[in-house]
Amino acid sequence: MSNLDEPVSSYLSAPEQVIVPMGETYDLSKVVETINKENAITYESSDPKIATVDKTTGVVTALKDGKVNVTISIEGDEYYKEGKTTVEVWSRDTDLWEPLTLEAAEDGWLGLNCWNNAQTEPVKFKVNDGDEQQITNTSYWLSLNKGDKVQLYSKNVALSNFNIQGVKCYAYGNVMSLISPDGNWYENKGINGYAALTYLFAWLDVKKHSTRELKLPATELAPNCYSYMFYNSTLDEAPELPAEVLATWCYYAMFSGCTSLEKAPALNAQTLAARCYSDMFAGCTSLTKAPALPAKKLAIYCYNYMFGGCTALTEAPELKAETLDYGCYNSMFSGCSKLNKVVCLATTNATDALGNWLAGAGTDASVTTRTLVRAEANTKWTNNDGWDWGTANWYVPTGWTIDPAIPAE
């Protein structure tokens, strides 16, 4: 090619958009077209936290759900000017984009039950990605073979009282597919309806899939939104709960009675609400370790009976709050018979905050020592098995050692 007085514009072409499943890679260099192929091409991601791209090879690695722009640049020379184009790359979390899915673990019947608000806007479903169908009765039963998949959809933000029961199954996909009015569940992070997903999996023989995840992605919660969600189910591992600002009663009894639950989710919320965690893990008799509770400002009855009856629990979370609120730790570890240590750094009490909080804790024959670790500034603790309603006593049961020891008067 002969030299030109002025270089001409580069020809650089690439798809407007590519989708890369989270955790996988995609080679952009294979879809980039240019005339001046000998000139160096470079790649740059607008947000490497979502998706990285190798600067020279163009290999994209999807890290977390989201969207980035990858800028593709080509060097100029005496014949061609520098050129640029942009590709929109979706790093897609497959489970976040897939609607709530129940996969039968064995042959049997799956029941879909609609009561009250769940009847005001239809719940729809597909079996094995077939035709969309609509639940027309209060109780609707599907005959499934092992491996059959049922996907569920609804635009009812106030769903409430929709319950799944029957055959043993794996649950994965995004629960927001049931309560997204615009059908855009993969981007919906807000629950707007009272008790929207209450009792959803209650009493169900439900298990965690070996490679898929059940997604509860909401960061904006509504009162009672997840209450009793897995009540008395066979769930063995809880899904992630990303919300950092809670609503009243939002997790009430969410996993209560899940006797197979061995692993609790991380609870990173800093802003609590009345009874937000009340009864959350009550009766989870296989749970041995409690999740950390980082919040330092408490709310009325926020942790009431949270771990009540967790007879296998040996590790309690550190209770960092200095100021207690009405009923905040009431019955929190009641019946945790294998618990042997609690760290409570509170210095200011509140009515009923410690009522019954360690009743029956550490009473198993395997427990040889029981220790309450206190804040050094708080010397009001005393061993006492009594509890009177409406008091603000610093009581820890007899048989528990207070550490550091309370100085003699």
Set out the residue ranges of the language-model regions.
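Solvent-exposed loop and capping/linker segments of extracellular ligand-binding repeat ectodomains
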Residues: 1-4, 90-409
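Extracytoplasmic soluble-region selector
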Residues: 2-93
